[in-house]
């Protein structure tokens, strides 16, 4: 997004955790008011699915609390919130893509806290869009594609599951 914004005539503000603690409601309200944001994109999340089972409070602070803070600030300032969520809000048993009105049934802490974040956004009164994503990858961070590229350079043979869809 930052690279694309360089060629846009619009103004964009990007923050990271060092600049804005989205779990701090006051800091979020102040940042949104100061920037006069018209659109807020919430990409903040506690994404370590396994660790979330051990640290539910931290997962909840980011996945529900931060979403609620951003939604309330958006509502107070007339901004639209674009909220990034996950397919983990479902139980994973569907054989077809989920529709937006499919019943949710998260199986773990990560999915439950992301669903709680979706609900907090919906109940805030702000204008919003929620995107439920799956299998994201990029040149940044850890992801399946980067892992496979690294392993092919390290090993002569790989065993990879091929019965998963996303």
Which sequence ranges carry the predicted segments?
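A short helix->loop->beta-strand "cap" motif at the edges of active sites that frequently abuts
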Residues: 76-80, 126
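Conserved catalytic-core motifs of eukaryotic protein kinase domains, centered on the activation segment
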Residues: 50-57, 92-96, 141-142
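SDR active-site strand-loop-helix element
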Residues: 15, 40-44, 81-86, 91, ...
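Catalytic helix-loop patch of NAD(P)-dependent Rossmann-fold dehydrogenases
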Residues: 61, 66-69, 89-131, 135-136
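N-terminal Rossmann/SDR dinucleotide-binding element
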Residues: 1-39, 117
């Amino acid at each position: 997004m930052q690279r694309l914004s360089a060629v846009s005539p619009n103004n964009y503000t990007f923050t990271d955790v060092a600049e804005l603690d989205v779990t701090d409601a006051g800091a979020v309200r102040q940042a949104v008011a100061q920037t006069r944001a018209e659109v807020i994109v919430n990409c903040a999340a506690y994404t370590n699915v396994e660790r979330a089972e051990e640290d539910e409070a931290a997962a909840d602070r980011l996945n529900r609390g931060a979403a609620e803070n951003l939604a309330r600030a958006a509502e107070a300032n007339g901004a639209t919130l674009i909220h990034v969520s996950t397919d983990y809000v479902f139980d994973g048993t569907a054989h077809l893509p989920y529709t937006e009105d499919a019943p949710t049934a998260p199986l773990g802490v990560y999915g439950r806290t992301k669903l709680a974040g979706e609900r907090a956004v919906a109940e805030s009164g702000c204008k919003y869009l929620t995107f439920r994503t799956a299998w994201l990858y990029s040149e940044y961070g850890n992801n399946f594609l980067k892992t496979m590229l690294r392993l092919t350079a390290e090993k002569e043979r790989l065993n990879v599951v091929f019965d998963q869809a996303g």
